[in-house]
């Protein structure tokens, strides 16, 4: 999702002994502003819990806490063929999912890269046409003889969308760099279904889900110890099962066939945590990113911890050092002085540079930006990359700790997905150890931590399929799938 390549061996750390005093001073300054101590993590978690509760109240809060209308736990016995499409930050994924009915599934998939310009196209139809065309290409490839029976489709839509029932999604606001007009505050399901129908594809969108909810449900399908689904990728988010009686904003809106004790999957959308800037330790670089973003004042937590922004935080800090005369002296930085010219693959590659003199980093700056670097400058760049990556890992688990504390979970599995979790060097270990710091666990091995972050199942693909299966079952049994009258 954020262009992270295959893993390389863990890098060897060079000595800082030869770094000049003025650069060491800058490194120390960066360590002060980017290091997140345990007491800060605990304060962030405490505030997070209160914001989660506000989001479930009738009045609402910064964190949307969107009911996902998944009102059953998967049994693992769900079976059948389903299609899933996953619209995330960078790619459109189309998946054929075969649920085995024995806590197993098989998937066949294709990815279609979203053209960068499509994120901000002024023609709202263009996005849905692209998705429908990709879906048709996939169907033609997988079913050359055609389809005899309509196939149910689960649509993973990884943006804040409110739902009054499982097969609708009203976009609240664009995130992840998207800003397409005339879609916000509208139901996206009929927009997509219209383009599918126009192409005579025998498919019905039966469930719209968020990728994080999909991660939760797919992982629960194979592992009933799952307590949360989380995404560490282009965006950052968490989903979990709450209890209907604890969701104040749903009181009086549910059918009689939904008991107060019924579970309800909640898509938190907690990238918007602390939009009021009460507790998160923002730096001047975070403030610049926010002020120059399409939506200033929104998605504060995401802008500090998600993959979409890590490279830009690094670039801004290096530009600051350049303007102060500390690095890249007497060089042309015109190629480098462009917002988001560094995606998250850059700090990742710098962190895993295996050479003591950081030759890969030297090549990276020369080849991509025409910048010559000294060994000492590269050591600053490397340390800064480590600090930014570690801060993201540590802050990102505050949402996990908050939900586990709110729900009273002492043990369990947190199913994690996303390119940053899967491929950013050291992220898994740093995230796990931040949880350890918040809780004060004494165990020394990650495998022994009471709450473990584990790799998710195929979240958005299989998750969309399992949710479509659960929705179909409810409909077949005549049960409610949304708010009364929706």
UniProtKB/Swiss-Prot annotation:
Residues noted as binding ATP in the record, renumbered to the chain: 86-91, 111, 307-308, 344-348, 419-423
GO molecular function annotation: ATP binding; D-glucose binding; fructokinase activity; glucokinase activity; hexokinase activity; mannokinase activity
Superkingdom of the organism of origin: Eukaryota
GO CC terms of this entry: cytosol; mitochondrial membrane; mitochondrion; nucleus
Activation and inhibition: Subject to allosteric control. Substrate inhibition by ATP.
Binding locations of substrate: 158, 175-176, 210-211, 237, 269, 302
EC number: 2.7.1.1
Hexokinase large subdomain: region residues: 210-458
PROSITE patterns in the record: HEXOKINASE_1, HEXOKINASE_2
Region of interest (Hexokinase small subdomain), ranges: 75-209
Coiled coil: none
Catalyzed chemical reaction(s): a D-hexose + ATP = a D-hexose 6-phosphate + ADP + H(+); D-fructose + ATP = D-fructose 6-phosphate + ADP + H(+); D-glucose + ATP = D-glucose 6-phosphate + ADP + H(+)
Modified residues (Phosphoserine): 15, 158, 245, 272
Role according to the record: Catalyzes the phosphorylation of hexose, such as D-glucose and D-fructose, to hexose 6-phosphate (D-glucose 6-phosphate and D-fructose 6-phosphate, respectively). Mediates the initial step of glycolysis by catalyzing phosphorylation of D-glucose to D-glucose 6-phosphate.
Stated name of the protein: Hexokinase-2
């Amino acid at each position: 999702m954020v262009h992270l390549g295959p893993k390389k061996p863990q890098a060897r750390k060079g000595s800082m002994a030869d770094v000049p005093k003025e650069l060491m001073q800058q490194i120390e300054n960066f360590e002060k502003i980017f290091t997140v101590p345990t007491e800060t993590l605990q304060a962030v978690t405490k505030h997070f819990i209160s914001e989660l509760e506000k989001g479930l109240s009738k009045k609402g809060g910064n964190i949307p806490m969107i009911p996902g209308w998944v009102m059953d736990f998967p049994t693992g016995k769900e079976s059948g063929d389903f299609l899933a499409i996953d619209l995330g930050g960078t790619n459109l994924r189309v998946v054929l999912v075969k649920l085995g009915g024995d806590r197993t599934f098989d998937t066949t998939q294709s990815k279609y890269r979203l053209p960068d310009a499509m994120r901000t196209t002024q023609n709202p139809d263009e996005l849905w046409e692209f998705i429908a065309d990709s879906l048709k290409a996939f169907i033609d490839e997988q079913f050359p003889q055609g389809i005899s029976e309509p196939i149910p489709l689960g649509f993973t839509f990884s943006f804040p969308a409110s739902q009054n029932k499982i097969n609708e999604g009203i976009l609240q606001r664009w995130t992840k760099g998207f800003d397409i007009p005339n879609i916000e505050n509208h139901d996206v399901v009929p927009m997509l279904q219209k383009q599918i129908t126009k192409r005579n594809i025998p498919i019905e969108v039966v469930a719209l889900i968020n990728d994080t909810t999909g991660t939760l449900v797919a992982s629960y399908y194979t592992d009933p110890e799952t307590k949360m689904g989380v995404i560490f990728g282009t965006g950052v988010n968490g989903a979990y099962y709450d209890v209907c009686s604890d969701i104040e904003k749903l009181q009086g809106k549910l059918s009689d066939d939904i008991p107060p004790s019924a579970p309800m999957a909640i898509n938190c959308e907690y990238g918007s945590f602390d939009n009021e800037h009460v507790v998160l330790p923002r730096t001047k670089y975070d403030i610049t990113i926010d002020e120059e973003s399409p939506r200033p004042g929104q998605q504060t937590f995401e802008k500090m911890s998600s993959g979409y922004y890590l490279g830009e935080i690094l670039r801004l800090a290096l530009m600051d050092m350049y303007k102060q005369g500390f690095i890249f002296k007497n060089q042309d930085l015109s190629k480098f002085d462009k917002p988001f010219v560094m995606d998250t693959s850059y700090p990742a590659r710098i962190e895993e540079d295996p050479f003591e003199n950081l030759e890969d980093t030297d090549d990276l700056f020369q080849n991509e930006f025409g910048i010559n670097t000294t060994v000492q400058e590269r050591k600053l760049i490397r340390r800064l990359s480590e600090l930014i990556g570690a801060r993201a890992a540590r802050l990102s688990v505050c949402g996990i700790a908050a939900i586990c504390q709110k729900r009273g979970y002492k043990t369990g599995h947190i199913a994690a997905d996303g390119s940053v979790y899967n491929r950013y060097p050291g992220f898994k270990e740093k995230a796990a150890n931040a949880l350890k710091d918040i809780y004060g666990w004494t165990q020394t091995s990650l495998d022994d931590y009471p709450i473990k972050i584990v790799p998710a199942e195929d979240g958005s693909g299989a998750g969309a399929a399992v949710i479509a299966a659960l929705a179909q079952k409810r409909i077949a049994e005549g049960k409610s799938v949304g708010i009364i009258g929706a």
